[in-house]
């Protein structure tokens, strides 16, 4: 039986992970739950799952939860802050960690799980975007196991031979006959909207994704296609892919989740309904398969598949991310930080939808001008750069 810590338990991925665990209760035990500040949701989860350990991102949230758990006679040990989240990520009695904290906040807890040699179910793409080679090196050094949860990376993973699956970050695609990885994306809710109308997009419009059920931040990232840009960077690191081996294609139906093209002309595609329980179940049970509770794909109802090349005039954030990917670690760390600040400002109605790309571009240029030769050889140096990029972004937001 696998023993789980779920980081980001109150979010969309956390909910889907618990759904798979419930579907297969004889194979998974939930030992620890970690979350941000959603005390009410965490209380619900604690009442249902009765974890031994819980961590909340802030002390006030942890204190409030402690009182509520005591009132309900739930005897869970409650931790707080980043240290608390890191603690439950490296518990001796846990072998598998779902890393689903959104954004840069997930980097240190995820790295704690890596250093403890856990099986990492990586849903937090920002951790790899921010730390790149440092993360890949740590996985090897500490004997951790890395399995990708993002539907696209999980699809690519499933289409690759086992010798690559067990050597992520260090594999040789060319040696295994892979000519290219085709990273698919839906194009978000505005793929057919006139570019001139994007300035008027509201947060409510941006988070209404046509195919997937996701949290607000990733929904906005999907609308700008920054999500695909971050996934591009993540795929570069996971699969050790060169620029020539990595391509993005828009597939509005979200049925094909990504593809791998081989030298002999074969293309392997992973398909399924757009439901995160499928890739989550794949990583939770790897190399076996378990019931995810997802309806089987009915090809008689799927309809036509369409594929479109991405339009960078419509999706400038995607172009920024692809460019940053090959400029260096300073560029991807800085861009990720800028984007988190810009998306938060947009969701708070402080800036326009189209300002997100402008702010990201301004910060990327500033980071590249000031930190191109910076030695990013530790988590501390990455976090310092992340903070500086956020400061640049906040300055740009205040000027809008």
Swiss-Prot record:
1-deoxy-D-xylulose 5-phosphate binds at residues 125, 151-152, 186, 209, 222, 227-228, 231. It is an enzyme of class 1 (oxidoreductase). Mn(2+) binds at residues 150, 152, 231. GO terms for biological process: isopentenyl diphosphate biosynthetic process, methylerythritol 4-phosphate pathway involved in terpenoid biosynthetic process. InterPro entries: DXP_reductoisomerase, DXP_reductoisomerase_C, DXP_reductoisomerase_N, DXPR_C, DXPR_C_sf, NAD(P)-bd_dom_sf. NADPH binds at residues 10-13, 36, 38, 124, 126, 215. Its cofactor is Mg(2+); Mn(2+). Disulfide bonds: none annotated. Pfam families: DXP_redisom_C, DXP_reductoisom, DXPR_C. Its EC number is 1.1.1.267. Pathway: Isoprenoid biosynthesis; isopentenyl diphosphate biosynthesis via DXP pathway; isopentenyl diphosphate from 1-deoxy-D-xylulose 5-phosphate: step 1/6. One of its GO terms (molecular function) is 1-deoxy-D-xylulose-5-phosphate reductoisomerase activity. Keywords: Isoprene biosynthesis, Manganese, Metal-binding, NADP, Oxidoreductase. NCBIfam families: Dxr, PRK05447.1-1, PRK12464.1. Catalyzes the NADPH-dependent rearrangement and reduction of 1-deoxy-D-xylulose-5-phosphate (DXP) to 2-C-methyl-D-erythritol 4-phosphate (MEP). Belongs to the DXR family. This is 1-deoxy-D-xylulose 5-phosphate reductoisomerase.
């Amino acid at each position: 039986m696998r023993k789980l810590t779920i980081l980001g338990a109150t979010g969309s991925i956390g909910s889907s992970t618990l759904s798979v665990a419930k579907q297969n209760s004889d194979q998974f035990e939930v030992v620890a739950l970690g979350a941000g500040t959603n005390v009410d949701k965490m209380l619900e989860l604690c009442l249902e799952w009765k974890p031994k350990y819980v961590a909340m991102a802030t002390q006030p949230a942890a204190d409030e939860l402690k009182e509520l758990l005591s009132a309900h006679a739930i005897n869970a040990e409650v931790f707080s802050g980043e240290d608390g989240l890191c603690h439950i990520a490296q518990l001796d009695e846990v072998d598998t960690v779902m890393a689903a904290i959104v954004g840069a906040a997930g980097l240190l807890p995820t790295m704690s799980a890596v250093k403890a040699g856990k099986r990492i179910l990586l849903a937090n793409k920002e951790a790899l975007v921010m730390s790149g080679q440092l993360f890949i090196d740590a996985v090897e050094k500490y004997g951790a196991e890395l399995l990708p949860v993002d539907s696209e990376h999980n699809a690519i993973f499933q289409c690759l031979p086992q010798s690559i699956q067990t050597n992520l970050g260090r594999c040789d695609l060319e040696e295994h006959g892979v000519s290219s990885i085709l990273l698919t994306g839906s194009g978000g809710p505005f793929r057919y909207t006139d570019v001139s109308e994007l300035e008027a997009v509201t947060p409510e419009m941006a988070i209404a994704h046509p195919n997937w059920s996701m949290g607000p931040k990733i929904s906005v990232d999907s609308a700008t296609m920054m999500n695909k840009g971050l996934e591009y960077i993540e795929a570069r690191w996971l699969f050790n892919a060169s620029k020539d081996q990595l391509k993005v294609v828009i597939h509005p139906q979200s049925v094909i989740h990504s593809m791998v093209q081989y030298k002999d002309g074969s293309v392997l595609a992973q398909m399924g309904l757009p439901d995160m329980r499928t890739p989550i179940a794949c990583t939770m049970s790897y190399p076996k398969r378990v019931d995810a509770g997802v309806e089987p794909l009915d090809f008689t109802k799927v309809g036509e598949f369409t594929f479109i090349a991405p339009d960078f005039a419509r999706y400038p954030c995607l172009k920024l991310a692809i460019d940053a990917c090959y400029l260096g670690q300073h560029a991807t760390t800085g861009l990720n930080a800028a984007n988190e600040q810009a998306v938060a400002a947009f969701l708070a109605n402080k800036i326009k939808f189209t300002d997100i790309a402008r702010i990201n571009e301004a910060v990327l240029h500033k980071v590249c001008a000031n930190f191109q030769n910076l030695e990013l050889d530790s988590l501390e140096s990455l976090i310092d750069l992340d903070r500086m990029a956020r400061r640049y972004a906040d300055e740009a937001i205040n000027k809008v």
